[in-house]
């Protein structure tokens, strides 16, 4: 399959809710879905990401892939795909995000990280690559990833969740980088890793 360009903040596909992946009466999934899923894994891996939503590569369908440790610093990772995810979370704290504990990045905002308030626990239900029901649940980094990727599919970037000085810093970063306009992307493997992995 292939590594494909990742869309950058400002591309309309990132700011529009995605469409559910059609499921046949017999539970079958579209014939072209395995190729899309493989492209997503290839692209996420080339970018050293922990997750990638379909709209980040320009496909407005409701699915994401992940390769994420349960908590920061762990080397054991969970890897898979969720089709048509539905998110459930604990309450999001109303305090300012901690600059050390709550830092978050995004492949569609390459090289930037900002503290982002998220729920401590999250669960996603949906379908796996075979169309079988799947439930993923986690805390810490895994919960953050579930919320981040599902947010993409709802048409939001983590920048939309930022508050106070973090929101102002993100707005300046978008302007400084010339982002916020349609048509921008970057190609993992062809440019230096924007996060320095």
Swiss-Prot record:
Pfam (any one): Pep_deformylase
GO biological process, one term: translation
Keyword Protein biosynthesis on entry: yes
Top EC class of this enzyme: hydrolase
Note on how the cofactor is bound: Binds 1 Fe(2+) ion.
EC number: 3.5.1.88
Keyword field: Hydrolase, Iron, Metal-binding, Protein biosynthesis
Family as reported in the entry's similarity comment: Belongs to the polypeptide deformylase family.
NCBIfam families: pept_deformyl, PRK00150.1-3, PRK12846.1-4
Name this protein carries in UniProt: Peptide deformylase
Encoding gene, per UniProt annotation: def
């Amino acid at each position: 399959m292939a590594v494909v360009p990742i869309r950058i903040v400002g591309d309309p596909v990132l700011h529009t809710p995605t469409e559910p992946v059609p499921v046949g009466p017999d539970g079958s999934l579209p014939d072209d879905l395995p190729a899309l899923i493989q492209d997503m894994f290839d692209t996420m891996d080339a970018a050293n990401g922990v997750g990638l939503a379909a709209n980040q590569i320009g496909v407005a369908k409701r699915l994401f892939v992940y390769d994420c440790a349960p908590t920061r610093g762990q080397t054991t990772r969970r890897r898979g795909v969720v089709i048509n995810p539905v998110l459930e979370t604990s309450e999001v704290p109303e305090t300012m995000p901690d600059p050390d504990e709550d830092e978050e990045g995004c492949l569609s905002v390459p090289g930037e990280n900002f503290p982002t308030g998220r729920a401590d626990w999250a669960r996603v239900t949906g379908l796996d690559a075979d169309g079988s029901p799947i439930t993923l649940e986690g805390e810490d980094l895994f919960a953050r990833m579930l919320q981040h990727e599902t947010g993409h599919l709802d048409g939001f970037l983590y920048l939309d969740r930022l508050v106070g000085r973090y929101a102002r810093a993100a707005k300046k970063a978008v302007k400084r980088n010339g982002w916020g306009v349609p048509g921008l992307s970057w190609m993992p493997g062809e440019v230096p890793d924007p996060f320095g992995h």
